[in-house]
Amino acid sequence: MNLFSALSLDTLVLLAIILVLLYRYGTCTHGLFKKQGIPGPKPLPFLGTVLNYYKGLWKFDMECYEKYGKTWGLFDGQIPLFVITDPETIKNVLVKECFSVFTNRQDFFPVGIMSKSISLAKDEEWKRYRALLSPTFTSGNLKEMFPVIEQYGDILVKYLRQEAEKGKPVAVKDVLGAYSMDVIISTTFGVNIDSLNNPEDPFVENAKKVLRFDYFDPLSLSVALFPFLTPIYEMLNICMFPKDSIEFFKKFVDRMTENRLDSKQKHRVDFIYLMMEAYNKSKDKDSHKALSEIEITAQSIIFIFAGYETTSSILSFTVYSLATHPDIQKKLQEEIDEALPNKAPPTYDTVMAMEYLDMVLNETLRLYPITNRLQRVCKKDVEINGIYIPKGSTVIIPSYVLHHDPQHWPEPEEFQPERFSKENKGSIDPYVYLPFGNGPRNCIGMRFALMNMKLALIKVLQNFSFQPCKETQIPLKLSRELLLQPVKPIVLKVVPRDAVITGA
């Protein structure tokens, strides 16, 4: 009996020691912000502050900004997140100290071959990709892609006309998402698809599988809580991206590169062709060695991942904003009609020269920054503007907060394209307007994305006006998704411009 009691006591002591050690491990970094006097929500052991993300990143960040001010601290598990909103500090992180300290993005999950993509690559590997890929987005290459994108604009118009003739309202994200998917796949892989009418196309199915992501997926959450698991997952070939879809695109890239290397014929310009050509045009062939087929596959998939959701969502938010502001919609249509009389086909130069279209799109990007946040990992201990940031920490720049701050934007919740007029845009601080980031690691595909969206808007607004209907949610409520989305799908009435326009 005494032995049993002794063993029980030893067991209890051992359990107590284990629990104390676990608690200390799960909270070992949680005193960092308190030491510096940086406010923030109280973290939980192991979890940190991640449970607050259930509110939606944009909403949680707004609550923190209102409660704590310009700088606050969060924890993804045990990883400290320094959230900054001061423009000068943001400039230091994104530009001045980009190469020396804040080069890389945060690892959210094991990514497999996608670590070879420009968005997820690190340090010298990222610099090499950037040097090789930047020339693919020149205005000359975009002009060559323009007719390909325009043909999908025509398909979009044809589909919307059919829907308008039925007299039924349209779920715009479904339609504009199909347009975005067609453009991304066609300009990346040189393949013509029609996902509006062929949603079971294997390219479409595999692309959509790649796009599925949930921060609270057990795999993502386990990495947030226990970062040391990432290399273990990588060794075990466990990846957030579906293996069958990765293999589908890899096989296609392999076939494509073989065919093009064997053929002497001139090929249609697409991103895979341009990536193959990038090495031949590189001035520094020693450091900028050619992209391997794995690397080309990774870039191709990241183009889909980065381009589809952002383009379709921004276009959806834009037509919603136009439908709920008919005076702005009319003014934009007048600019389009003046530049392109009698529904003349647009040209690259005409599209990029439209000032009011640019203003409307910029204001949509301000109101609805799809990614909510920018983030950079600190590579070494550093002090910026009085804030000590230790190696391994992450700096968060809350784009949504900056874009909705009344200190920078009077009446920030109002849709006012005039903010970006010639007279006004010079007064905008470039570090409080960050739809595509800033600095050397900004969005490499920004010019392509803007051209794509502008062309789609011109095509549809030449032919239609958008109106609210009884299914339209006004005001628009945003969901808790990781990427900015409405709670309910945006549904609008599409009215051909040669028809009589009536009230909703």
Swiss-Prot record:
InterPro entries: Cyt_P450, Cyt_P450_CS, Cyt_P450_E_CYP3A, Cyt_P450_E_grp-II, Cyt_P450_sf, Cytochrome_P450_3A. One of its GO terms (molecular function) is oxidoreductase activity, acting on paired donors, with incorporation or reduction of molecular oxygen, reduced flavin or flavoprotein as one donor, and incorporation of one atom of oxygen. It is found in: Endoplasmic reticulum membrane; Microsome membrane. Its main location: endoplasmic reticulum. Induction: P450 can be induced to high levels in liver and other tissues by various foreign compounds, including drugs, pesticides, and carcinogens. Gene3D superfamilies: Cytochrome P450. Heme binds at residue 443. Transmembrane segments: none annotated. It holds the Pfam family p450. Its EC number is 1.14.14.1. GO terms for cellular component: endoplasmic reticulum membrane. Keywords: Endoplasmic reticulum, Heme, Iron, Membrane, Metal-binding, Microsome, Monooxygenase, Oxidoreductase. It catalyses: an organic molecule + reduced [NADPH--hemoprotein reductase] + O2 = an alcohol + oxidized [NADPH--hemoprotein reductase] + H2O + H(+). SUPFAM superfamilies: Cytochrome P450. It is an enzyme of class 1 (oxidoreductase). It is a peripheral membrane protein. CDD domains: CYP3A. It comes from the Eukaryota. Its cofactor is heme. Cytochromes P450 are a group of heme-thiolate monooxygenases. In liver microsomes, this enzyme is involved in an NADPH-dependent electron transport pathway. It oxidizes a variety of structurally unrelated compounds, including steroids, fatty acids, and xenobiotics. Belongs to the cytochrome P450 family. This is Cytochrome P450 3A16.
